[in-house]
């Protein structure tokens, strides 16, 4: 019981910290309707699955949230089957998500270390990594750029993986 709850909570917080931040602006339509629908569908599937996972531990809360957008009871809802989840993730590359989360974390870390707000603008994020990783990253590059509030993201292939974040200058320091 405790281990199941611990793993579900860990996934929930990781999802909120990383994925939700990566797709938030796209879900609101920053890159058009098709991109927004794609992000919203992924978020909807994840919320539905998370509610089912949390239902045994938080029965009343999950039932209430479920009723806001679904009919019936979360406790009687079928689990998503493996083929549904595979189909939903068919175009996704787990490496792309991992790269996006890693690079967004580097941008956040740079802002925190400089005592800046997470909304502080970034001039450029320079990413160097292997060919397979940089190719995977291309599919989430715009999500990372928007989430980090970066003007640009440059990607180069190299043997040593690195992420360098250059924050924008303080407009009041001038």
What are the functions of these language-model segments?
Residues 1-174:
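Feature 926 captures the class I aminoacyl-tRNA synthetase adenylation module centered on the KMSKS loop
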């Amino acid at each position: 019981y405790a281990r199941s709850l611990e793993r579900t909570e860990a996934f929930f917080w990781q999802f909120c910290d990383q994925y939700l931040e990566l797709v938030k602006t796209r879900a609101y339509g920053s890159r058009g309707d098709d991109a927004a629908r794609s992000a919203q569908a992924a978020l909807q599937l994840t919320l539905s699955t998370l509610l089912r996972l949390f239902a045994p531990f938080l029965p009343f809360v999950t039932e209430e949230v479920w009723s806001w957008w679904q009919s019936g009871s979360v406790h009687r809802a079928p689990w998503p089957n493996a083929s549904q989840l595979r189909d939903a993730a068919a175009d996704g590359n787990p490496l792309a998500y991992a790269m996006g989360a890693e690079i967004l974390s580097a941008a956040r870390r740079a802002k925190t270390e400089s005592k800046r707000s997470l909304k502080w603008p970034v001039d450029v994020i320079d990413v160097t990594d292997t060919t397979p990783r940089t190719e995977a990253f291309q599919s989430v590059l715009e999500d990372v750029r928007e989430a980090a509030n970066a003007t640009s993201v440059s990607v180069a292939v190299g043997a040593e993986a690195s992420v360098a974040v250059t924050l924008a200058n303080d407009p009041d320091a001038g």
